[in-house]
Amino acid sequence: MKRQAAFIDSKKLLKGALHCHTTRSDGLGTPEEVLKKHVVHGYDFVALTDHRYYNFANYGDAPLTIIPGMEMDGSLPGAGWPYVHCHHIVSVGPEKAQGNGFEQDQRFDSY
């Protein structure tokens, strides 16, 4: 079997992060600090996906594409302190202008 390159040379490859946390949940940097680090390291896009907080704030001055998003987790009450996470779901987009109904910094405790 002949080996072939996985990517076509004529296409532009983008460097990005689709799962990223800030101090709005358990991350170590503010949204602005996280975006700045990604810019410094040459990223083209980043999705801010804090736990149970939907991020769609306008960071229009950032020189990379910001994708709004959120991470939800399912939990089992009474299975440990204070609960056991059994799965995580990362969602990205759509933008607020498209009518998703979420408020910035609104916490979601169920889905």
Predicted regions and their residues:
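A metal-dependent hydrolase metal-coordination microenvironment
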Residues: 3-111
